[in-house]
Amino acid sequence: GADGAAQVLRAKHIVLATGARARQLPQLPGDGKTVWTYREALTPPALPKRLLIVGAGAIGIEFASFYRAVGAEVTVVEMAPRIPPLEDEDISAQVAASLKQDGIQVHTQVALEQATRAGDAWQLTLRQQGGPQGTLQLQADVVLVAAGIVGNVEDLGLDKTRVQVEKTHIVTDAQCRTAEPGVYAIGDVAGPPWLAHKASHEGVMCVEHIAGLHPHAL
């Protein structure tokens, strides 16, 4: 409660919708000033001259396109062989070509090895994966970490239930049910795709299932 006292709530059905947060990289602890997550990227105090984005999923590519359109020099680095990494190869090829046509530098199959702040700039060392081995040196004024998100599964007491957690996300079936009867999980905490309309549909589907209806699964 508001006074700090513990409360015990009981329910026949429980829906977990605790969301997720940006994944942090040990080499780039977020400070909100020169190392951003998607939250800081939405409300920047000023336009960075050089922006480097780590991760080429939906979030990384969206911000790359936006910041390039408003005048920033943008570089995108990704560990996977192509971007976006989870799309079909022909779609990835079109996206990569479009980004390069807009003047966005794209580096795939590279892993962040080291990051140091020197004066007003970040110096990043990336290890090339596959093909010719070596390192790549890049500089940026601001680094946006878009390397995925982590489900908010802590402090929920899940260890006392049959709810399963894999890769920081709650495991559910097609009706958003967990392994614990009566406990559901929806939205970002239930894993990808991390999209608002997916979470909204899951919420409706989950409640309809609880009400005894037979909603269509995703």
Predicted regions and their residues:
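Glycine-rich dinucleotide-binding loop and its adjacent helix/turn
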Residues: T18-E73, V77, D102, D159-T161, ...
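Hydrophobic/aromatic beta-strand patches that form the interior of the parallel beta-sheet core
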Residues: V15, W36, T75-V77, H107, ...
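Helical element adjacent to the flavin cofactor pocket in flavoenzyme catalytic cores
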Residues: A5-V8, T18-A22, V95-V106
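FAD-site-proximal beta/loop scaffold in flavoenzymes
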Residues: D31-L47, Q137-L138, V142-H214
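Feature captures the FAD/FMN-dependent oxidoreductase FAD-binding
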Residues: G1-H13, V106, E113-Q123, N152
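Rossmann-like dinucleotide-binding cores of NAD(P)H-dependent redox enzymes
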Residues: L42-T43, P48-L52, A58-Q128, Q133-L136, ...
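Short glycine-/small-residue-rich Rossmann-like dinucleotide-binding loops
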Residues: G19-A20, Q128-G130, L144, G148-I149
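Core beta-strand elements of the Rossmann-like FAD/NAD(P) dinucleotide-binding domain
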Residues: G4-H13, P132-V142, A179-E180
